[in-house]
C-alpha cells in the first residue's frame, strides 16, 4: 500500500509507544502501533526511524539494548509494516530538500525516502518539521 492512505510513523511517535514517563502520549502511540500489529491499519517505517529509535531509547536508558532489539525485531518481522529505506540517490535528494526548505538533514532524508517510496503522510509530533508541499504531517498525539 502506498499513496494518500499510507502513513509513515516518525521516530518520536515510536519512542512514545515505549515511554513509561509520558503516559498520555504513550497510550496514544501504543494504540497506533497496536492497530498496525493487529492488521487494522497499515503503517510505513524506515530503517532510519528504527535506528533513531534505538539511539533515542537506549541513550536515555528508557530501554536496554536487549529490549530495543526485541522491539525492532517485532516491527521488522511484522508483515503489517511497510519497511522502506534510502539509497545514495536518496541522500542527494535529501541534501537538495534540506537546502530548498532550510531544514535539518535527517528530516529531509526521511522526506526524500518517503517521496521515493510513494508515501505522502507522516504521523509525527513535529509537524512543523515537514512543511514540504508533498507531505501531510499529522500529530496523532494532539
Which residues does each PLM region occupy?
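A general alpha-helix detector
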Residues: 13-14, 52-56, 93
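Acidic, PIN/NYN-like endoribonuclease modules and their adjacent C-terminal/linker elements
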Residues: 1-6, 111-142
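Short, well-structured N-terminal submotif of metal-dependent ribonuclease cores
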Residues: 1-45, 61-67, 142
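Active-site neighborhoods of divalent-metal-dependent phosphate/nucleic-acid chemistry enzymes
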Residues: 81-121, 125
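Alpha-helix capping/helix-boundary segments
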Residues: 13, 49, 90, 109-110, ...
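Residues that scaffold the ATP/ADP-binding catalytic core of kinase and kinase-like folds
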Residues: 16-18, 56, 133
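Helix-adjacent hinge/juxtasegments
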Residues: 55-70, 76-78
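Structured helix-beta-strand junction loops
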Residues: 39-40, 78-79, 133
Amino acid at each position: 500500500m502506498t499513496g494518500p492512505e499510507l502513513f509513515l510513523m516518525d521516530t518520536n511517535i515510536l519512542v512514545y509507544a515505549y515511554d513509561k514517563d509520558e503516559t498520555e502520549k504513550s497510550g496514544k502511540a501504543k494504540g497506533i502501533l497496536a492497530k498496525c500489529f493487529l492488521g487494522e491499519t497499515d503503517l510505513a517505517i524506515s530503517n532510519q526511524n528504527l535506528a533513531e529509535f534505538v539511539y533515542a531509547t537506549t541513550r536515555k536508558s528508557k530501554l536496554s539494548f536487549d529490549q530495543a532489539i526485541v522491539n525492532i525485531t517485532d516491527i521488522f518481522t511484522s508483515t503489517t509494516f511497510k519497511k522502506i529505506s534510502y539509497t545514495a540517490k536518496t541522500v542527494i535528494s535529501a541534501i537538495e530538500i534540506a537546502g530548498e526548505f532550510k531544514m535539518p538533514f535527517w528530516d529531509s532524508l526521511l522526506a526524500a525516502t518517503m517521496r521515493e517510496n510513494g508515501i505522502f503522510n507522516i504521523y509525527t509530533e513535529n509537524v512543523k518539521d515537514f512543511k514540504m508541499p508533498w507531505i501531510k504531517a499529522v500529530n496523532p498525539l494532539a
